[in-house]
Amino acid sequence: MGKNELPLAVGQRLRDHPRDDTEPFTNNAGHFRNNTEHFRNDAGADERREAEVTTTTEPAARPQSDGQPMPPLRVALLGCGTVGSEVARLLTDSADDLHARIGRRLELVGIAVRRLNRTREGIDPALFTTDAAALVARSDVDLVIEVIGGIEPARSLILSALQHGASVVTANKALLAEDGGTLFAAAEQAGVDLYFEAAVAGAIPIVRPLRESLVGDEITSVIGIVNGTTNYILDKMDTEGAGFSETLADAQTLGYAEADPTADVEGFDAAAKAAILASLAFHSRVTAADVYREGISEVTTSDIASARAIGSVVKLLAICELSDAEGDNGQRRVSVRVHPAMIPRSHPLASVGGAYNAVFVESRSAGRLMFYGPGAGGSPTASAVLGDLVTVARNRVRGAAGPGESSYAARPVSPIDDVVTRYHISLEVADVTGVLASIATCFAEHGVSIQTVRQQGRGSDAQLVIVTHRARDAALSATVRALRSLEAVREVASVMRVEGEG
């Protein structure tokens, strides 16, 4: 660029800016005129005019309004346990990178905890407070991160933060599954963001694809392994032949399971996540109370061995399906359930081992999609929290809000009796003539078709392992009740659903 071209470019761009920004250039007006006259009188005017036009298209540096750096976005953190402490560390260690990605610095201004007398390495003690309510009500707080969990006081604190104009990032699956509608409505009314990627499957990005990337598609099913504790237990039972109690104790020793493992092993944790996934996938509000739930505490080594014998593996699955059947309101029904199930070893979810999570999505246009990764732990969950934090911070800088809740449908949730799938039934029977015929008749009378039968054992008793074709859950339950009344049936040892192709 020639020395006479730069003033023209700057001079033309300055017309779009306020006069106080242009005043330093006023004394150069004669210089501008002289240079323009030079171009007019010079030979090759056409070429000069072309150069003049080209020059004016180059952008000048955007001036700052007052020459001062923009103030930081102030962050309040609720909770400083495994996840919260990792979030606090990342906010400090990655401060420069976060600044570059957002365009504004993030400043951690307070951390709400239950007790102040605990030592928390690497975090400024002056940040800690036990007054969470006062922290979220501060007028200078722009962003609130909630990682304390549970229903209360988390719900009240999030609502207060939203009402005071702060955007919120939460990892609270239990609260979202119970009363997410109230929180989303409050965020929309306040014109701020409520993000929750970390609430489901840890570091796996599944909420955003369902909420944004696939929003133009029709999702027909979401099937996931969304609890790392139970997946670790079932994987060890499969690969090492260990029993449930033994493997649970091992998981507790390694920190994969809590001292009270009920929420994990009885499926409560997975049910909350299933409710969130179903709400996102089907644009209809589903709560944890709508989710049918069974845990894995009754899964035996015999179940694991039986699954292996038919080329399957046992997993605790969160299953969300869009049905073709319609409810009374004309909306298509959805089925949302959590329970152990046998799936073929060829299924993508079958190879998910250890404490890992995975979510398998099927949609009308995109087809089959698989999301896989670590589903729990401080670092993976903190990664998801920070991802949301960057997004809501960018929205804050632009003065905008991201997508809100998309629950425009009111889809009825089908009861478990209406679910249609295959079943694996293990029976202890007397090894007498006609027993197989009587059992087959029992299945037929209740409209359940047998796909395969396998007999094990010799002597006075035998074990029959039956896999059915697809049938309604209600029909299968009636069949099991009838089987228990047969004289030749000693025991219905186990009943487990079979998912996947077959």
Predicted regions, residues:
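N-terminal amphipathic/hydrophobic targeting modules at extreme N-termini
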Residues: 7-14, 64-65
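Asparagine/serine/threonine-enriched low-complexity, disordered tracts
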Residues: 17-28, 32-35, 39-42
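N-terminal glycine-/serine-/threonine-rich beta1-alpha1-beta2 phosphate-ribose binding loop
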Residues: 54-164
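Rossmann-fold NAD(P)-binding glycine/threonine-rich loop
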Residues: 155-160, 173-210
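Oxidoreductase and adenylate-handling cofactor-binding alpha/beta cores
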Residues: 206-219, 233-242, 272-286, 388
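Substrate-binding/catalytic subdomain of NAD(P)-dependent oxidoreductase enzymes
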Residues: 237, 246-351, 356-358
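Glycine-rich phosphate/pyrophosphate-binding beta-alpha loops
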Residues: 367-369, 373-379
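A conserved regulatory-domain signal marking ACT and ACT-like small-molecule sensing domains
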Residues: 384, 389-502
